[in-house]
Amino acid sequence: MWRSLGLALALCLLPYGGAESQGQSSACYKAPEWYIGDQNPMLNSEGKVTVVALLQASUYLCLLQASRLEDLRIKLESQGYFNISYIVVNHQGSPSQLKHSHLKKQVSEHIAVYRQEEDGIDVWTLLNGNKDDFLIYDRCGRLVYHLGLPYSFLTFPYVEEAIKIAYCEERCGNCNLTSLEDEDFCKTVTSATANKTAEPSEAHSHHKHHNKHGQEHLGSSKPSENQQPGPSETTLPPSGLHHHHRHRGQHRQGHLESUDTTASEGLHLSLAQRKLURRGCINQLLCKLSKESEAAPSSCCCHCRHLIFEKSGSAIAUQCAENLPSLCSUQGLFAEEKVTESCQCRSPPAAUQNQPMNPMEANPNUSUDNQTRKUKUHSN
């Protein structure tokens, strides 16, 4: 229960309710009209909470996201959240169009998967979205949340919580399309949440009284005024949630935003995240520049801006949340780490200079001195 309240608070702290747009906030505004062929998916979803996922069929992580979206749909329906429309919009690029069927196979017929026309208006651009973004609209089609990586990653609970908030809370004001059944359901949910909030408070009060009573009988001294209380059981959001959208595009070279040591102390980071936090470079990969690139044809470090690592057996999938100036095909230290993404390619000296790292994790073209915490690199 406290975890749920913590998530709701974290979502509230997102600027403009988690929504973002070019130039001004799009929170609580209706989505711009967009079509797939002659279909208007948003119009078809009127009267329902609508979840729009921007997924790329050529991306392994996106296929996992689609599969998890199906799992989330089933979970929410089992809890009584029925009146929700789920929409997946595939990327407009040719590689994604060729693998559209792979994306569609990840979900049931209850989730609509749309293929964009390559020569049509790009829906992602129209919605000001990026890969793996989730846009959540209320029943009147008003944008309640626009979540990007890493908070749109479905192993985290933020998308689920955002859907529930859009379903039962009038964040954008009253909507006359809410059914009586949904109103009754939300009243029940609100009442149950209020009861759960009261129960721990009473138990905590009784526990404090019991401890004080026991201390009096045992002759224990009172705790010092300077004594700090133990850590809260409230689940905290990952570092940077409340300012995630504000800092998009203001990436600090070589460091994952959520790895800020001062902000992330005490948070329950995954093993992969902790490993990333210890590295100077986010991810050292061998990169080959695309033939179209005007840059020198040398190896480079692939510094993705919003890295997400997904363990699947021994495989590690790395992906970038947004396009960066230069394209490169990245080959990891192991065969299964091969990634083709939009990455920022830099020449080896610029990429590796002043970066503390383990030589085993570094680019083979770089030699690193852990004492001086510097690396020297040479071109192929």
Swiss-Prot record:
Position of the signal peptide: 1-19
Claim: Phosphoprotein is one of the keywords in the record: yes
Domain of life: Eukaryota
Free-text tissue specificity from the UniProt record: In the kidney, expressed in the cortex with no expression observed in the medulla (at protein level). Expressed by the liver and secreted in plasma.
Biased composition annotated in UniProt, kind: Low complexity: 348-360
Keyword annotations of the record: Glycoprotein, Phosphoprotein, Secreted, Selenium, Selenocysteine, Signal
Gene coding for it: Selenop
Annotated stretches, region: Disordered: 196-257, 346-380
Localization per record: Secreted
A Gene Ontology biological process term: sexual reproduction
GO CC term (a single one): extracellular space
The name this protein goes by in its record: Selenoprotein P
Skewed-composition ranges (Polar residues): 221-237
